[in-house]
Amino acid sequence: MAIAKRPYHQSARAAAAENLRKRIVEAFHRLLLKRWIDEITLDEVAASAGTTRQTIIRLFGAKDGLLDAVMDLVRAEAGPRMSTPADVSVRAALETLIAHYEAVGDMVVRFLAQEERHSALRPLLAQGRDEHRAWVAERFGSTQCGLSELERERQITRLIVATDIYTRKLLRRDLGKSQDEVLHLMVAIINKEKGEVT
């Protein structure tokens, strides 16, 4: 009987530990959606997660370890959110992108502003840049014949600028455009670049 209970207790303990880690990461993530990294204390994260500062230090080392765990969460959430077939319409692809930006755009802009101060952000942001470029090239890259490699690269660069997180920030936050207006403007820019009528 004692042998049967031991695995149960170990698996229950492991599940509780995993649940605690998840609560801590999600608490830090919620705070990051609204605030700068340097403004958030481990005590705030601990209070939000229902644990102690010392437990966070034991599990994650310091704030950078916790930031790494949040980066893993952000990557995991972005994959399904951004997955659309390559052959969907410009509008459908941009609806997916803009929904993603609505979910995490402000946090990503804050991350970009803090990239030099927090080395833990660099891998995620570099991966994000690479994935955005690939996403743009796959969905909007020219099918026009006769473009040289240089012209194709320039076109992809223009399309990246049109769909970049900073373009969304300019339109949505700085100019106060609605989500629908941002979509309309981005669709028009992409279609014009591709030589299509909006």
State the predicted function of each range.
Residues 95-109, 119-157, 163, 180-195:
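Amphipathic alpha-helical packing segments from all-alpha helical-bundle domains
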Residues 1-48, 59, 65:
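Basic, helix-initiating cap at the start of DNA-binding domains
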Residues 54:
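Key DNA-contact positions within bacterial/archaeal DNA-binding proteins
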